[in-house]
Amino acid sequence: MASDNGSNIMASIDEMMYSVGVETLHPGGLEKTMEMAEACKIIHGSKVLDIGNGKGFTAIRLAQKYGCTVVGVDMSKAMTDYAKMSAETKGLSQQINFMNIDAHQLPFGDNTFDVVFAECSTVLMDKEKAFKEFVRVTKSGGYVADLEMCWRKPPDRKTVDRAFEIWEGFSTMTFEEWRDFFAEMGLTEIRLNDFSDKLRNMTTLYIKALGVMGILKISWRMLKNKSLRKAMLEYDKFFNNNKEYIGYGYFVGRKE
């Protein structure tokens, strides 16, 4: 089991990033999110399931751009409540429904959604159990898509253990293993997009996402909060020390 210190590292950083207006917390940002959406052929009227919806930014973007309907699911009630308020504020509450449920046991019938869309969530889940549910609720001819941190090559045990500690329960695979996993789940026409080079300098990515005002706000919060400052340093240290292993990419597969 992860230590309290380790398990709180990402929670502290995520909360801080959201508080200063960062909408997507993965390298590649909104660009890769929407690129993955295009690969899923989302159109007006599509029915999309957003796994681990967080504060609802992806679901809202998809609904706004495509005119699709979205159901978002998340284990966090706080995130679910925030997402609901965001959708209501933007006049999208009739188009988007956020639910506080476990994605391992989806309360939807078979063949319900045109697209099942996940970002940075299944690495914290029982992947086989979760994907069986994702595929089950996807319509024939529909798509399952997932954007995750992946191993560029098999890591050593120390790296695996530290990743598990930082992201409590974290478990990922190499790009090749992810592609094989999609195939094992019965998906075809599997598309892989490896954008690991986006990770070359995490500090630069943060600066670009935050902007001047965001940087000032975060600097002030870190000056006042020693534990938050420590968490940020631990996170940055892990990425900088393991660049040879850490990658990011997305996978899209079609259900026959």
Model regions and ranges:
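Short alpha-helix
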Residues: S171-G186
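Conserved alpha-helix/loop element of class I SAM-dependent methyltransferases that forms part
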Residues: H26-H44
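A short glycine-rich, Lys/Arg-flanked "PGG" loop and its adjoining helix->strand segment in the class I
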Residues: E128-Y143
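A short SAM/SAH-binding and catalytic strip from SAM-dependent methyltransferases
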Residues: V115-D126
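Short, glycine-/aromatic-enriched active-site segment of Class I SAM-dependent methyltransferases
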Residues: M149-G169
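Conserved Class I S-adenosyl-L-methionine
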Residues: N193-E256
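A short acidic, Gly/Pro-enriched loop at the edge of an enzyme's catalytic core
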Residues: H104-V115
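Class I SAM-dependent methyltransferase SAM/SAH-binding core
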Residues: L49-I51, K55-Q105
